[in-house]
C-alpha cells in the first residue's frame, strides 16, 4: 500500500477509536431494543456446532467495535468464555472488566493460563480470543501492510489440540451507525511446509 493509503487508514483508525470510546460508556446496558442496530451474518454454522455440543474457538480481531460482542455472544452460543489481556491502565481495566461481566460473558484473565480454555472447549463451550496482538519474538510472523507482524498462535494451537473448529468473528461499523457482525468458519488445514507447524499455518490463514 502507498504511504497516502496508509495515512488514510491510520486517520480512519483514530476516528473509529473515538467512536468506540463513546460506545464503551453504554454497551453494557445494551438489550433486545438494540438488536436492530446489530446485523449478524453467518451464524448458521455456529448454531450447528452448538446443537452438536461442539466446542468452538472464536477468533476476534480488533475491527469495528469488538466490545459490542460481549452483550451479543450469550445470545449466539450457550455459556461463552473469553480470554482477556489486561490493559496497562488499571483504572480503565477495572471499568472495562466490570462492564464486560455485566453482559453475562465469562471473562478469564490471561494469567490464568490455557487450562480453563481447554476444559471449556472439551465441554462444548465457545472460547473467544482477541489474538491479533503483538506476541513478541515467540509469536507467528505474518505479513501485514507489507511488514511482518507477530501474532498469537494460541487460537490455532487450542483448535488443533482439541480438534475444535475456528470461527472468525469480526464486527464492522456501518455508515448509518449500525454494526455488522460476520461469522466465518476457518478451513481446517495441515502444515504448508515440513518446517512449519499446523498451528502456524492456520494462524497465517486467518
Language-model segments: what does each one mean?
Residues 2, 11, 51, 75, ...:
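Non-catalytic C-terminal accessory region of glycerolipid acyltransferases
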Residues 23, 67, 79, 132-134, ...:
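Acidic side chains
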Residues 45, 69, 95, 113-116, ...:
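Short, hydrophobic/aromatic alpha-helical segments in well-folded domains
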Residues 1-60, 93-98, 104:
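Membrane-anchoring hydrophobic helices of lipid-metabolizing enzymes
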Residues 26-29, 40-42, 68, 89, ...:
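Generic structural "secondary-structure junction" signal
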Residues 36-40, 89, 107-110, 148-149, ...:
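A conditional alpha-helix N-cap/helix-loop micro-motif detector
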Residues 16, 54-111, 137-140:
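Catalytic core of membrane glycerolipid acyltransferases/transacylases, capturing the structured
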Residues 40, 82, 107, 183-185:
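Generic preference for hydrophobic
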